[in-house]
Amino acid sequence: SQIGLLINASVTRDNFEPAVSVGVHDRLELPRHALNFDITNACLGFVNAMTVASTMIDAGAIDYALIVAGEDPSPWHRTAVRILNNPDSTREDVLAQFATLTLGSGAAAAVIGRADRHPEGHRIVGSVSRAGTEHRNLCIGGEADQGMNTDAEGLLKHGLELVAQAWEQAHQDGWEWNDMTSYVTHQISNAHTNAIIEAVGIERERIPLTFPKWGNVAAAALPMTLAECAPTYTKGDRILCMGVGSGLNTALLEIQW
């Protein structure tokens, strides 16, 4: 009854309209006063939702928010397999569909509330974001039967450039993120992880990896990884969530445990 906002941040959905959030709202029997909507921003949606929810809480509009993301890419898997099984498929088809085949299924949820009511909680400290929307055509996902076409090499190159720009801007703004307890990144591949390490100079040992087990779970990947690592964190630890999504957009968000 205290939830004032529900945000669904998933990429995959069963239908174009209405918003996925309305089904979640109904099944959870949330109160009628609870605002609900979707934030869709590729794999960055959950981090964006955390920022929006925390801003609304700080503004006094709500006391608590529930953020959810559930991903099921299996219809896109089937389309990718159909395309690649075509006798006329080419090397370019393989490259365009490869990223689709690395997607995994999973779900995550988070409740965000007012810090003054929960001094023992994990505090969202602040965030920095950057947009590189000139690269919006590097990954195009349509309806499930149309599939998703991805320029994986281009996404890696320009995505990491954007992360590096956000990192530098954060430093200029006074954020000291060079010695965080943990860097929870979007989970894609070893190549992506290595590129982040090189781009911003962080230690590999501080980056938890879940993609070998779950694959790339789109918007749920980062919060699932955060939940997996939660038992290892202690009060006072500083966690940097490093989200990135096709489009291109990136957001770096600090949580103090």
Predicted feature locations:
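Conserved active-site "lid/cap" helical segment
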Residues: 1-4, 140-179, 191-200
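Short coil/turn connectors at secondary-structure junctions
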Residues: 2-4, 31-35, 59-65, 97-98, ...
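Glycine/charged-rich beta-loop-alpha catalytic/anionic-binding loops adjacent to active sites
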Residues: 2-7, 28-39, 88-95, 144-147, ...
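Short beta-strand segments
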Residues: 9, 40, 65-71, 112, ...
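Claisen-condensing/thiolase-fold acyl-transfer catalytic domains that form or cleave C-C bonds
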Residues: 12-14, 31, 38-61, 160-164, ...
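Acidic-glycine-rich active-site phosphate/pyrophosphate-binding loop
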Residues: 15-30, 75-89, 136-140, 192-204
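Acyl-CoA/ACP chain-elongation machinery
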Residues: 61-80, 132-138
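Condensing-enzyme catalytic core mediating Claisen C-C bond formation in acyl metabolism
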Residues: 86-157, 244, 256-257
